[in-house]
Curated annotation (Swiss-Prot):
Subcellular location: Periplasm
UniProt-recorded name of the protein: Outer-membrane lipoprotein carrier protein
Keywords: Chaperone, Periplasm, Protein transport, Signal, Transport
Biological source species: Albidiferax ferrireducens (strain ATCC BAA-621 / DSM 15236 / T118) (Rhodoferax ferrireducens)
Biological role stated in the UniProt entry: Participates in the translocation of lipoproteins from the inner membrane to the outer membrane. Only forms a complex with a lipoprotein if the residue after the N-terminal Cys is not an aspartate (The Asp acts as a targeting signal to indicate that the lipoprotein should stay in the inner membrane).
A Pfam entry, by short name: LolA
GO CC annotations, alphabetized: periplasmic space
Lineage: Bacteria, Pseudomonadati, Pseudomonadota, Betaproteobacteria, Burkholderiales
Length: 213
């Protein structure tokens, strides 16, 4: 199953000229719920004599801080990733297979923690070393390096597009320990929408193969 990551737009006055780390701090403090569309491009390292393999997928994303989020991959294959606050559910529609993992054991040093799970910057700093990164492609970037060396995540960069009245979370770049790079781009973001109470509930479909880890 594909790994994931996260997004959103934070409307906030006075962020023009601020660094990416400041934009990340404001976003975590002020955006408690969010909803958006996303496109994800995953590039695997090139093998000898071959071009890098590129896969593109798209779908929707919702979150409610802290610790609840949902990715719904719609193209090219249907997959759902749902964190309900206790359990992280991964559902592959084509395989009719569900994987359930204890959320507290898997989310600390992940892209999801950066955007959707952590309640504040201090919580992020417990698991990541955070810093401003150089501007690139017209965006301001915050860099996050996991403090734990046990996981597969090597680094994350969060890109913000800043203006006079708003800072928009525009991109998320993820590099894993195998050299695979994932870039998520976000659109149609809604800031602090009122999400239905059952948005993050998940019940394995009848007949699905359920694997608990």
């Amino acid at each position: 199953m594909k790994y994931f990551a996260t997004i959103c737009i934070a409307a906030y006055a006075g962020l023009a000229g601020a660094g990416g780390l400041k934009s990340l701090e404001v976003f975590v403090k002020t955006v408690n719920t969010g909803r958006a569309d996303f496109t994800q491009v995953v590039t695997a390292p090139a093998k000898a004599g071959q071009a890098p393999r590129v896969k593109t997928s798209s779908g929707t994303f919702e979150f409610s801080r802290p610790n609840r989020f949902k990715f719904v991959y719609k193209k090219p294959f249907e997959q759902n990733i749902v964190a309900d606050g206790q359990t992280l559910w991964l559902y592959d529609v084509d395989l009719n297979q569900v994987t359930a993992r204890q959320q507290s054991k898997v989310l600390g040093s992940t892209p999801a923690a950066l955007i959707a799970a952590a309640p504040d910057l201090r919580a992020l700093q417990a698991d990541f070393t955070l810093a401003d990164a150089p501007d690139k492609d017209g965006l301001q970037w915050a860099a996050a390096t996991p403090k734990s060396k046990d996981g597969q995540l090597q680094s994350v960069r969060v890109g913000f597009r800043a203006g006079e009245q708003a800072a928009e979370l525009a991109a998320l770049e993820i590099l894993d320990s195998f050299g695979q790079r994932s870039v998520l781009s976000f659109s149609r973001f809604e800031v602090n929408p009122a999400l239905p109470g059952n948005s993050f509930q998940f019940k394995p479909p009848a007949g699905a193969d359920v694997i608990r880890q």
